[in-house]
A protein has these predicted regions:
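Fe-S-dependent hydro-lyases/dehydratases of central metabolism
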Residues: 1-152
């Protein structure tokens, strides 16, 4: 569903949002990412233009794969879900608290404009923070490679 009420496919919607440079967010339930093709699920998420996933909980490997793709995993406080908070997905979201001093597991604010919701940043290690800041593992490796070669 597009903001104007037009019903379309997820893929078509993602293309329109990408064209308008609108980053996307996914609202999810428990154990987000459980399933067999998890690495491709994270790649597909990124390719659709999703910049963050906010879930009640994450499947461990999938959370790591999201980070590896540069997608920010955010977790609702215990017992909270997007449904219990009355979030429909039609809201416009902002994430506050991301900074150069980001710490593993830091609390952030998910804002809908009229509401502020506390979420936990599920970048669980300092290296995951670096991956996220660089746009994922591949970008981190390329930056390190380029940095080393420029020193020579």
């Amino acid at each position: 569903l597009m903001p104007n009420g037009e019903v379309t496919t997820i893929y078509e919607a993602s293309l329109k949002y990408k064209e308008s440079r609108t980053p996307l967010i996914v609202l999810a339930g428990t154990e987000y990412g459980t399933g067999s093709s998890r690495d491709w699920a994270a790649k597909g998420t990124l390719l659709l233009g999703v910049k963050a996933v906010v879930a009640a909980s994450f499947e461990r490997i999938h959370r790591s794969n999201l980070v590896g793709m540069g997608v920010l995993p955010l977790q609702f406080e215990d017992g909270e879900t997007h449904r219990s908070l009355g979030l429909s997905g039609e809201e416009e979201y902002s994430v506050f608290g991301l900074s150069d001093n980001l710490k593993p597991g830091q609390d952030l604010i998910l804002s809908t404009g009229d509401r502020e919701i506390s979420v936990t940043c599920r970048l669980d290690t300092q290296i995951e923070i670096e991956y996220f800041k660089n746009g994922g593992i591949l970008h981190t490796v390329l930056r390190n490679f380029m940095s080393e070669n420029l020193k020579k």
